Design a protein with these regions (language model features):
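Active-site/binding-pocket entry motifs
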Residues: 11, 54-55, 120, 241, ...
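Membrane-interface helix/helix-cap signal primarily in integral membrane proteins
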Residues: 1-71
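Catalytic cores of large soluble enzymes that bind and process phosphate-bearing ligands
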Residues: 17, 21, 25, 40, ...
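Generic alpha-helical secondary structure signal
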Residues: 24, 28, 43, 55, ...
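N-terminal transmembrane-helix/juxtamembrane module of multi-pass inner/ER membrane proteins
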Residues: 23-34, 266, 270, 284-292
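Hydrophobic alpha-helical transmembrane segments in multi-pass membrane proteins
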Residues: 5, 57-230, 294-310
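Alpha-helical transmembrane segments of multi-pass integral membrane proteins
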Residues: 185-288
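Hydrophobic face of alpha-helices
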Residues: 26, 30, 45, 49, ...
């Protein structure tokens, strides 16, 4: 249920109490980014750091849709997974550095719990948006399986995660992101080898598989597909994920500890973001950026999925 309200007599409105809680903290942090980061990158940093997309105008969203980057600009499951991996690796490194900790809690268990706690904390910072909650539930299933030392295949873990998401929010099946996220993960697990350690080749393979595999579903859900999206994602995913987003998070964490300490990280993140954004704007304005497809029926979707699978 969504609604928009307004105040009839603004002059008569008065604040009864100062804002409190996580939402008030997020609002204050978002305002700090807007005030202390100059240039056009501030709205995007607010979205990447806090999931606050209110400052993005129609032109920005049009560019993101045309280049297939909408899934990266706001806090998504991918970002939550990145934070979870960071905490897991950090705790695992501490356990390797201090082997005595393993007598209290096995390293694998500690890393799994740290990943879950880090993902949950980041989801709260993001305002508990549905994509972040969905990813936290997936991570919780994986952590539970590891802590309980249960042997489960990837298919079983995905099925349990799907069940957990539906128990949390049954109406999520009406959201396109639900189908795209689970279909994308399932497609990658099915098509990609699990023992491929070549990072560049694995990234290119994952990008190709995700693009081809999700193309029929994307066209069916939205009636359009970004033809330049694969090329834009080849640059945006590694650059934004491993440079811009970490700097945004470092700045937010430092700013939460001491006001003013995170400005340098935000400004550096803005500079790094602006290195790539003009190119994406140009790419989104090309005549071949978007492919519009008439509405299709279920038979066409099934045929397209079979073709992608083949």
């Amino acid at each position: 249920i969504a609604a928009t309200g307004y105040v009839r007599v603004p002059a008569a409105a008065h604040q009864t109490a100062p804002p409190q809680g996580v939402d008030a903290w997020r609002e204050g942090m978002s305002q700090r980014i807007a005030e202390r980061v100059s240039g056009p990158s501030a709205p995007y940093l607010r979205a990447l750091a806090l999931g606050d997309t209110r400052a993005l105008d129609d032109a920005a969203w049009a560019t993101l849709r045309a280049t297939g980057l909408s899934h990266l600009i706001a806090i998504s499951g991918f970002h939550v997974g990145l934070v979870a991996a960071f905490f897991a690796l950090l705790v695992a490194g501490v356990w390797r550095w201090q082997p005595r900790l393993g007598t209290l809690l096995p390293r694998l268990h500690a890393a799994s719990i740290a990943a879950l706690l880090g993902a949950a904390a980041y989801a709260v910072v993001a305002g508990l948006a549905l994509p972040t909650v969905r990813t936290v539930l997936m991570i919780a299933v994986v952590a539970l399986v590891r802590v309980l030392r249960r042997r489960a295949s990837t298919a079983h873990i995905l099925a349990l995660a799907l069940l957990a998401v539906l128990l949390w929010d049954p109406l999520s099946v009406l959201v396109a992101g639900f189908w795209l996220s689970f279909a994308g993960v399932t497609w990658l697990v099915w098509c990609l080898p699990s023992d491929d350690r070549a990072i560049v080749r694995g990234f290119l393979s994952a990008q190709t598989v995700a693009t081809v595999g999700l193309l029929p579903l994307t066209v069916s859900l939205f009636g359009q597909a970004s033809l330049v999206g694969p090329f834009a994602n080849l640059v945006a995913i590694p650059w934004w994920t491993f440079v811009v987003v970490p700097l945004c998070l470092v700045g937010t964490a430092l700013e939460a500890i001491y006001p003013g300490a995170g400005v340098w990280a935000w400004q550096l993140a803005g500079w790094c973001f602006e290195l790539t954004w003009p190119g994406f704007v140009w790419l989104g304005r090309t005549t071949v950026a978007l492919w519009w497809v008439p509405e299709s029926d279920g038979v066409a979707l099934i045929a397209a999925l079979l073709g992608a699978f083949w």
